[in-house]
């Protein structure tokens, strides 16, 4: 009786493990996918920094989301507003890109530093992190959803 329970338990564990491995294998990215996704990140930065609102919006799916901007038109409007206010003198720098496969496409995380070139010498304007949902479309990889979380400096320590 105990042997049957053990064998049944072992069979369930093996089945679940196999299903997990199958899901991992189906969620994989090729070397070309990684290159294409890195290129998407670069296109995003170059477009927003150059004031190319349509090029910037084209890095998203038509129903894409950037923070609270939903859809192509809202993303174009955001890009135009950003560039009119800050964009002419700031540049986006990304580092530590991490791309992970998902059954739907991929997730991405990357650090963002905005450098203000309107000051002499150039200064760090702000820093943040992006969290992304990416999908592969007929036009290539696109952002489905992109959220930004700004870095917050710790509160100063009280004098002792």
Give, region by region, the residue ranges found by the protein language model.
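Short structured motifs
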Residues: 41, 92-97, 129-130
